[in-house]
Amino acid sequence: MDEKNILSVLDSDFIVRLRMTFKDTKRVYLLTDAYLGGDLYRLLSSRGPFPDMVAKFYVACVIEAFDYMHRRGIVYRDLKPENLMLHQNGYLKLVDLGFAKKVPSGGKTYTFCGTPEYISPEIIANAGHNIASDYWALGILIYELLSRKTPFRAKDDLTVYENALKGIHGIHFSNRIGRKAESLIKALCRQLPIERLGYQKGGVNDIKKHKWYSGFDWEGFHVLALPGPILPEINDPMGDLRNAKPLRRDIDIPEETSGWDATF
């Protein structure tokens, strides 16, 4: 229900748009706009790691989406390349708000959720979290876009969590990641949430003013005036699914009779 309620009040060029909802005896459905360029993970796997110019553009899309959500007290909690879809204009759309939650100003939430390699230390420690956890994840995203790897990767989730708790300053940065980008990543991935860039007094503008973004046209970007760095090949905007993941159709779901979805 949270995903439906949150999507219904969001209206941003950088976030998926909900058009309508409906249900049957087995499923509930969220009808959204289709973004036929595929997800960023697929693009990163085939064309990454990205140069700075491309990574800056894609991260800027996330910054705009986060700024819009955070101003409304909504924490996202599931940032990863798979949840960023490429529009035909080359811009990204933030999708899958299943973990998104409205948190009162000054408050925290305690649900353990997210993708292991992107989860912040305070979520791991069950210390309570807020929008600052999204900025931690943003730092992880920058690292992955520039290197095609996540900084705390390991063979199992427990070791990933242990690595994250040790902190970003013990992580080796490859030559693919320049000093300015490294500086931004470390500023976003501070262990203490109150010290993270984006969560301090200057808010998201502190990120926009970081030296990694020197010369970036934020005003033009905000109104979608900048050309997208990679334009997906889409022959038919009504049905070209070449960039989409194939759907599983072999799952048999029993009918729902509990009535939990009465108000959906």
What spans do the regions from the language model cover?
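Conserved short submotifs of the Hanks-type protein kinase catalytic core
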Residues: 26-39
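AlphaC helix of the protein kinase catalytic domain
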Residues: 41-50
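C-terminal regulatory tails of eukaryotic serine/threonine kinases
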Residues: 194, 199-264
